Amino acid sequence: MRGIDVTEAERILCGVLADLFAIPEVGPQDGFVRLGGDSIIAVQVVGAARRAGLRITVRDVLTLPDVAALAAAARPLARSARPGGDDGVGPVRPTPVMHWLDERGGPADRYYQYLVVRTPAGLTGQSAAEVLQALLDRHDMLLVIRDGSGWRTRPAGSVRAAECLRRVATEGREATAEEVGREVRAARDRLSVGGGVIVQAVWFDAGAGLPGALALVVNHVVVDGISWRVLTGDLARAWEAVAAGRAPAGALDPVATSFRRWSELLAAEAAGERTAAEAPYWNGVVRPGAGIAGRRPLDPARDHEDRAGHLALSLPAATAGPLLTSVADRLGADANEVLLTGLSLALARWRPCGPEVLVELEGHGREDIAAEADLSRTVGWFTTLFPTRFALDGLGAADAEDGGPTAAEALRRVREQLRAIPRKGIGYGLLRHLDPVVGKELAAAEPAGLGFNYLGRLGGPGGGDWQLLPAHGARLDAPGPGMPMAHAVEVSAYVLESADGPVLHADWAWADGVHDEAEVRALAEGWFRMLGALVVHADRTGPAAWSTLPSAVPPASGLTLDAIGQDELDDLAASLGLL
């Protein structure tokens, strides 16, 4: 027995998706990818569905064709509290990404993220403090401290919001970019993990009856992209309660699994058989021969983030909109796969690259490794870092520029490579940082020369209270002065809504002296050209042809793709005009 009415499940899930995509209506036949969804939003969908009493998985959200199918897969969920004794308070085991930060070196106090949101016209100093206090007391990791015994979280009430909040009067006007930048840097300099100063907030008060702005500056060790979505949602709910004269704490949903508990689950997983079985795979990925040629090796003593070169480019909504919605759906791929296909095509034309390239990818890290874990509302740094090896040989053909068949070959390779990664890459960090034997083997390998991070969609359409202010935006990877670069070239991509639709932004950084601006600009502009070529190719070939690509087809009963030779697959693709 299913135990749940499909129509009711459809109603719930349509409402969840409409809220997350900030659109008036979603119907049962609408598909998650067609709406512009990605794995980060999928985690939010799962969390919102849980709060409404439905159990679905991230895989369901990403692979099922529409809301009707997702509703049919949903199961009723019994509400449960945290496991006994898990109040989130106490020692926190260092997770793989926390070990990675320690190895990287530099001033961890200033490794921060920030986000600037609009504040409502009725906000006062007292109500701002009440809203902020509700966040501090709800989310354990905002109260973390690192002392001589290691990391530990403190009880609710240990940090007073008034001590974290600064008011800046702007006297009837919006804060300028210079004012916001100056205050964010000053807030960054006040952060101290040893002193337990993890959060700083700056309220730009335009005066009575006028909307203002709030800059939240948080040490990166306790926050990531999904955490920010949790925090901004809680800001809005806490304010609604305060404005109505209610206690804000009661307006915030409970957190099912604490970060402290998650750190224990990761340690147990690192010692398990599933993780040990991945060692040959990861040793194969990091084998020699996939480096990026630079003028010299990356030097942590001089290649610091504050000395890096920077380049910011934007892909207009006319291309980014279809690329991340209808085209991704038509290609049978998610946004990350489409973006990395374009990057592979660009890398194949980039002088420093050979026939293979090692790229370090970032994942959201909230993977399904334990049945008890519900991380949809947990604030913390869950990011997984893992290397991926892309084959570039043959992808430099000229036809790719015009959306020719090389684009299909690139997508096939990238999609199959990414889908072959065990457990979305979480095992690499467990082995690299929590396994004393395999960790040494992986540490000895040459690191990836390129880092890629897709942060997904940030904020809604803008303009509303507690929503991202595009004029000031956010920075979700902001190492402070003296932090060594992790890669010779790095790119962070994210999507912001505009009046014309979604715009893809790409922030590039490089170690000056290893590469120069002309080299990086050539790669950055080539990437955007190849993304445009994928739009052209998808329009040219149509959805029926793309859906037959090998990695887009789930195995039928009694038949697996392992039984089909590559020559046969190539013949099939050629018959459909893909090769």
Task: Give each language-model segment a name.
Residues 57-59, 139, 143, 232-233, ...:
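Extended, hydrophobic beta-loop-alpha segments that form or line the acyl/peptidyl-thioester binding
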Residues 44, 51, 133, 199-260, ...:
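Active-site-proximal acidic secondary-structure segment that organizes catalysis
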Residues 121-137, 152-195, 233, 279, ...:
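A short, small/polar-residue-rich loop/turn motif at beta-strand boundaries
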Residues 75-107, 129-175, 197, 237, ...:
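Short amphipathic alpha-helices and their capping loops
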Residues 10, 120-143, 216-233, 309-354, ...:
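Acyl activation and transfer enzymes in specialized metabolism, enriched
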Residues 1-109, 126, 130, 257-258, ...:
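Regions immediately C-terminal to embedded phosphopantetheine-bearing carrier domains
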